């Protein structure tokens, strides 16, 4: 197996709202990584690209949409996403490409533009929850993070103040990172005083939503050695996914991280990680998550090692176990897919002596980066190492400042040309017989489970297979008691989109272990009829159902769980075996649903020039000095050579008259509804330029327009639907 090294890195600034399009952000990071590696795009054999949920951009298969900016045009190309775990999964995929011997070099790119999504980027996470059993409760990631944080605190005895120390350290470390979005000198008191979102989570416990991109170049040993500098090797990789049924396990310990770490350690020859690793970059979207993930990386289910290190100050940049010297997601920012790759880049800087003011104390020869994603289930881990004495390289990166990095921060998308999109997507999700049986239980005022004899588990929600017993078929179903015990809870002040609830209103979400189903077989739902101050882990509760004539066979037929009264504790009811529902065309159920997200897309650096020209009735392109061509429409990068371009400084005027080279007559809108009149959509090419422009053709002629000479129609409207042409003459 070929050894694989990181030989170059690039990144944009991480910002709340970027003017650049996703492709422009990716191209900026790629150009920097190629320059750092001393290579051109022609030297790259393959490209791996990571972006997280498509719901952030509202563009299906978003990776393919920005392939040009990622340098993947006409190259072997792979796109993948596992939520926040993507940024470490991406270099793992790139490592596979090179380690296999098939490729000598691989460009790894991770990009995320979260800002287009409204009413808030966090609202996009509604799409990762089960559409039938969880989305109706209007959960968001803040809620399940808060549930996990509360369980973590309960299991390991942490206080909120102790956890807040992580946020303080990481934000301070970020003061020295050129890409950092929110570097700050704050105190534990500042964290504790910040706005409460969903107890125990406060504003300063959380990383920001971000736009940004990161790229690295991977190379075989032969290519890396030929560069004449000490390589930084990928020594071990690991990746594991746990079940999406996140209420079926104790949230206190990240088993998926520990398993991935064990795989990486075995590959790297590590037997004592606490002694053999010099730099730690765990994923830290919330401050408690850094400690949570460190428990997994140290393979310590007791949590004593991490607590001891925290109390000793070992996680400081000058400590014995420096954690997130970069500043992590909490300080640098969290453009979901790109965050993990930022951590990989940090290890490259640290282990090659290029980290500048962020360089950890002592010689660092080995580091570990880890990322996490989706429903608290993804673990991705990479171990990296250098060889020989630590080289201190006075590179560009050693002295880089924020103003040296690309990435244009906006106060508002409305400040630049942009396009609004309201998809209004609707769905009908089929249930199948197991889920139908489960939901019919709600209609009957019952909590139902399926039983696996292989592992002796009552499974909630009921399912036709066991995910831990080799997909063993399950055909036994039970009605369970509608009582249980609170395993963890959160008192929320925000809704599904992370927007404030009405004044005085809170929602209390809890994971309830249902009686008869085991300690860690929980059901997430609301609590009611209880003072928030009286809620605690271990609280005994009972379901409160809607009146029978109002039930619809949905999880919301259970209104909430209330505290169980002492006089109701007269012996636990036993599970009762039932027959599963037999499906027919009449009884087969489905769940209607809608994804309530809207988008506002910036036109980008190239688009800003294009729409300014359009308003004046003119057309310009962008000159690429490397390829010696004019690109149309205006562009911030050249798709062929990945050279960064300035659409303003390198603008070249073009004749606004062009020739139609392709056309189609459209009779329906994008939703399939008939148009009042058919519309010609044409592709137009222009003399002395590479590329073309799509738009409407305004004409009364029904003849096919291919070969027709047309000109741009001036308009001040922004958006592809406003680009139009008319015949010349």
Predicted regions and their residues:
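Condensing-enzyme catalytic core mediating Claisen C-C bond formation in acyl metabolism
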Residues: 1-23, 27, 32, 132, ...
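Conserved active-site "lid/cap" helical segment
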Residues: 1-85, 93, 152-159, 181-187, ...
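Conserved catalytic cysteine-centered active-site region
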Residues: 53-109, 113-144, 183-208, 240-242, ...
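Active-site-proximal alpha-helical scaffold in enzymes
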Residues: 81-112, 142-176, 216-222, 335-356
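A broadly conserved sequence feature marking short terminus-proximal activation segments
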Residues: 389-447, 549-620, 718-722, 728
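Cys/His-rich short segments
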Residues: 440-483, 612-657
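Glycine-rich active-site loops that engage anionic ligands at enzyme catalytic sites
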Residues: 483-529, 537, 657-698, 706
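Well-ordered alpha/beta subsegment
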Residues: 516-572, 687-729
């Amino acid at each position: 197996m070929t050894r694989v090294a990181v030989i170059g890195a690039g990144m944009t600034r991480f910002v709340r709202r970027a003017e650049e399009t996703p492709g422009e952000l990716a191209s900026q990071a790629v150009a920097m990584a190629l320059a750092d590696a001393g290579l051109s795009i022609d030297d790259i054999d393959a490209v791996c690209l990571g972006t997280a949920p498509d719901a952030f951009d509202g563009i299906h298969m978003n990776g393919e949409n920005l392939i040009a900016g990622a340098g993947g045009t006409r190259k072997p190309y792979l796109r993948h996403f596992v939520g926040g775990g993507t940024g470490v999964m991406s270099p793992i995929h790139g490592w596979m490409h090179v380690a296999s011997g098939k490729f000598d070099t691989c460009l790894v790119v991770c990009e995320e533009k979260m800002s287009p999504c409204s009413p808030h980027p966090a609202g996009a996470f509604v799409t990762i929850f089960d559409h039938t059993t969880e989305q109706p409760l209007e959960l968001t990631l803040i809620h399940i993070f808060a549930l996990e944080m509360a369980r973590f605190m309960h299991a390991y005895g942490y206080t909120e103040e102790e956890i807040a120390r992580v946020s303080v350290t990481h934000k301070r470390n970020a003061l020295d990172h050129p890409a950092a979005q929110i570097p700050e000198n704050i105190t534990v008191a500042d964290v504790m005083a910040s706005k409460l979102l969903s107890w125990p989570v406060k504003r300063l416990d959380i990383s920001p939503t971000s736009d940004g991109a990161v790229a690295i170049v991977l190379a075989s040993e032969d290519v890396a050695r030929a560069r004449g500098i000490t390589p930084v090797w990928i020594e071990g990789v690991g990746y594991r996914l746990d079940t999406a049924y996140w209420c079926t396990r104790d949230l206190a310990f990240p088993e998926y991280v520990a398993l991935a770490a064990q795989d990486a350690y075995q590959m790297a020859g590590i037997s004592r990680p606490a002694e053999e690793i010099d730099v730690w970059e765990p994923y830290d979207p919330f401050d408690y998550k850094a400690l949570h993930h460190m428990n997994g990386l140290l393979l310590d289910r007791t949590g004593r090692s991490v607590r001891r290190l925290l109390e000793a100050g070992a996680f400081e940049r000058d400590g014995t176990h420096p954690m997130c010297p970069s500043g992590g997601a909490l300080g640098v920012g969290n453009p979901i897919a790109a965050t993990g790759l930022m951590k990989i880049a940090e290890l490259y800087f640290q282990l090659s002596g290029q980290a500048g003011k962020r360089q950890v104390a002592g010689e660092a020869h080995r580091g570990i980066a880890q990322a996490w994603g989706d429903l608290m289930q993804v673990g991705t881990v990479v171990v990296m190492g250098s060889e020989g004495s630590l080289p201190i390289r006075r590179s560009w990166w050693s002295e880089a400042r924020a103003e040296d990095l690309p990435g244009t921060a906006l106060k508002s998308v409305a400040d630049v040309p942009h396009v609004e999109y309201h998809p209004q997507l609707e769905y009908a999700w089929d249930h199948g017989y197991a889920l139908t049986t489960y939901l019919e239980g709600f209609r009957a005022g019952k909590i139902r489970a399926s039983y696996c004899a292989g592992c002796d588990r009552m499974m909630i929600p009921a399912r036709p297979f066991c995910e831990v017993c080799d997909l063993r078929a399950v055909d036994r179903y039970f009605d369970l008691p509608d009582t249980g015990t609170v395993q963890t809870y959160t008192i929320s002040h925000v809704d599904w989109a992370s927007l404030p609830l009405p004044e005085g209103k809170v929602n209390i979400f809890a994971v309830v272990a249902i009686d008869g189903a085991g300690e860690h077989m929980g059901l997430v739902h609301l609590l009611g009829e209880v003072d928030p101050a009286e809620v605690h882990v271990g609280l005994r509760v009972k379901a409160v159902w809607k009146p029978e004539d109002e039930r619809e066979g949905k999880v919301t037929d259970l209104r909430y769980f209330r505290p169980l009264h002492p006089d109701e504790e007269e012996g636990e009811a036993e599970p009762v075996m039932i027959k599963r529902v037999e499906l027919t065309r009449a009884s087969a159920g489905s769940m209607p649903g809608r994804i309530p997200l809207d988008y506002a897309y910036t036109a980008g650096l190239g688009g800003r020039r294009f729409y300014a020209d359009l308003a004046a009735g003119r057309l310009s392109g962008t000159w690429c000095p490397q390829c010696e061509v004019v690109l149309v429409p205006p562009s911030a990068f050249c798709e062929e050579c990945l050279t960064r371009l300035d659409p303003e400084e390198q603008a070249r005027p073009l004749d606004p008259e062009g020739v139609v080279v392709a056309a189609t007559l459209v009779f329906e809108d994008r939703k399939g509804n008939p148009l009042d009149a058919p519309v010609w959509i044409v592709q137009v090419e222009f003399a002395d330029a590479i590329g073309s422009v799509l738009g409407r053709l305004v004409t009364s002629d029904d003849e096919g327009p291919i070969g027709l000479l047309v000109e741009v129609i001036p308009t001040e409207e922004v958006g592809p639907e406003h680009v139009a042409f008319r015949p010349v003459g």
